[in-house]
């Protein structure tokens, strides 16, 4: 408050040196002082518009865009649960909802839970993970919606054992699908999901999934000299993660990894040196 008073006096006197020295006041403090709505109130207002089916789709999209910007702040992300807005967000993931709003809902979920243990726990109180998995398994799902849903799932389960356990319980592994002709953006999201899966301890049950889904073979298939650099980098990182978790590669897998490394030898200057060398240790 003292800083705000000093700023006000400097503004009135026109003392530029003092203004520069004091700096700008906290916008939140200005809002409180002059009676502007606080951010939780703005979040509630946005959700009211989003929930209103009589509002135009454009206005609902604008409201969701505003809501998304607000929850990029971690305090506001945590306030989604505090002011009981999660269910409204998750409801917009349903197949009956316009696609653009579903995209926003999945995106907001991913942003809110990313690197945020409290929001990860809060989100799991609802059926949002089941909705996200369902989106990824829809036939002819729009690519943008699938990307946002994969992002949200990855953000939810990364470094969060309880989140992974729920993912496993809901047959989340069903979304880990590799298609050689897939858009590289989708491949990157799936690889990020695999990385998130491996961010928690590799127990026997998880190892069984790795074998059943032929995960190692699918990852190795990405190591191509004409492949997308980002995907190759991520694939190497995942093999490195598996090695760090003391995963036992079969002799045929080790041979295929060695072949993959030869394939991308000329790309060494464009990919992570640490991951490349770590993977080389697997075959030596």
From Swiss-Prot:
GO biological process: cytoplasm protein quality control by the ubiquitin-proteasome system; regulation of translation
Compartment annotation: Cytoplasm
Entries under Pfam families matching the protein: Fes1
InterPro entries cross-referenced by the UniProt entry: ARM-like, ARM-type_fold, Hsp70_NEF-Inhibitors, Nucleotide_exch_fac_Fes1
Annotated GO MF terms: adenyl-nucleotide exchange factor activity
Record's keyword terms, sorted: Cytoplasm, Repeat, Translation regulation
Gene Ontology annotations for the cellular component aspect, listed alphabetically: cytosol; endoplasmic reticulum
Keyword set includes Cytoplasm: yes
Domain of life: Eukaryota
ARM repeat residue numbers: 13-55, 117-158, 161-199, 204-244
Family per record: Belongs to the FES1 family.
Function, in words: Functions as a nucleotide exchange factor (NEF) for Hsp70 chaperones which accelerates the release of ADP. Required for fully efficient Hsp70-mediated folding of proteins.
Name under which the protein is recorded: Hsp70 nucleotide exchange factor FES1
Native organism taxonomy: Eukaryota, Fungi, Dikarya, Ascomycota, Saccharomycotina
């Amino acid at each position: 408050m003292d800083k705000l008073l000093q700023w006000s006096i400097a503004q009135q006197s026109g003392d530029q040196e003092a203004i520069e020295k004091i700096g700008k006041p906290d916008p939140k403090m200005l809002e409180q002082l002059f009676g502007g709505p606080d951010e939780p109130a703005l979040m509630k207002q946005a959700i009211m518009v989003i929930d209103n089916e009589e509002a135009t789709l454009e206005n609902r999209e604008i409201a969701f865009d505003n809501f998304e910007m607000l929850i990029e702040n971690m305090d506001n992300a945590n306030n989604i649960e505090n002011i009981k807005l999660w269910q409204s967000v998750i409801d917009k993931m349903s197949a009956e909802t316009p696609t653009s709003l579903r995209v926003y809902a999945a995106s907001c979920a991913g942003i809110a839970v990313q690197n945020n243990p409290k929001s990860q726990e809060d989100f799991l109180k609802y059926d949002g993970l089941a909705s996200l998995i369902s989106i990824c398994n829809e036939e002819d799902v729009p690519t943008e919606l699938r990307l946002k849903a994969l992002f949200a799932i990855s953000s939810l389960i990364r470094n969060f054992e309880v989140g992974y356990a729920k993912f496993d319980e809901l047959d989340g592994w069903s979304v880990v699908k590799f298609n050689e002709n897939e858009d590289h953006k989708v491949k990157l999201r799936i690889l990020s999901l695999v990385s998130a899966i491996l961010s928690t301890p590799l127990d026997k049950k998880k190892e069984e999934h790795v074998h059943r889904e032929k995960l190692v073979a699918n990852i190795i298939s990405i190591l191509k000299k004409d492949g997308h650099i980002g995907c190759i980098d991520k694939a190497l990182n995942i093999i490195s993660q598996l090695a760090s978790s003391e995963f036992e590669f079969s002799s045929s897998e080790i041979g295929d990894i060695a072949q993959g490394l030869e394939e991308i030898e000329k790309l060494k200057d464009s990919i992570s040196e640490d991951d490349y060398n770590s993977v080389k240790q697997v075959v030596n």
